């Protein structure tokens, strides 16, 4: 990964959600709030680009530059 680029993981799934993680360059990661999960407006302002429906659902304390996202699977794909 280039140090100035945002990296998007492949998507992975469980019975209810589709997941992906996004790795920010260290400089950008300094702008990630430590007190709350980001709204879509906040993560888009950082330059993260994804389709609609993704939610920042967890803060990974050891690596705050990695943003964890999920969105519900369509009903017909849920187990």
Curated annotation (Swiss-Prot):
Subunit structure of this chain's protein: Forms a homohexamer that can probably bind six kinase subunits.
N6-acetyllysine sites (modified residues): 4
A Pfam family hit: CKS
Name of this protein: Cyclin-dependent kinases regulatory subunit 2
One Gene Ontology term of the molecular function aspect: cyclin-dependent protein serine/threonine kinase activator activity
Organism listed in the record: Homo sapiens (Human)
InterPro entries for this protein: Cyclin-dep_kinase_reg-sub (IPR000789), Cyclin-dep_kinase_reg-sub_sf (IPR036858)
Keywords, ordered alphabetically: Acetylation, Cell cycle, Cell division
Gene name, Swiss-Prot/TrEMBL: CKS2
């Amino acid at each position: 990964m280039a140090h100035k680029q945002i990296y998007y993981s492949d998507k992975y799934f469980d019975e209810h959600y589709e997941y992906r993680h996004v790795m920010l360059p260290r400089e950008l990661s300094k702008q990630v709030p430590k007190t709350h999960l980001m709204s879509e407006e906040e993560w888009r302002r950082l330059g993260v680009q994804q389709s609609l429906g993704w939610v920042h659902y967890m803060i990974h304390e050891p690596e705050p530059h990695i943003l964890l996202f999920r969105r519900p699977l369509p009903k017909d794909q849920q187990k």
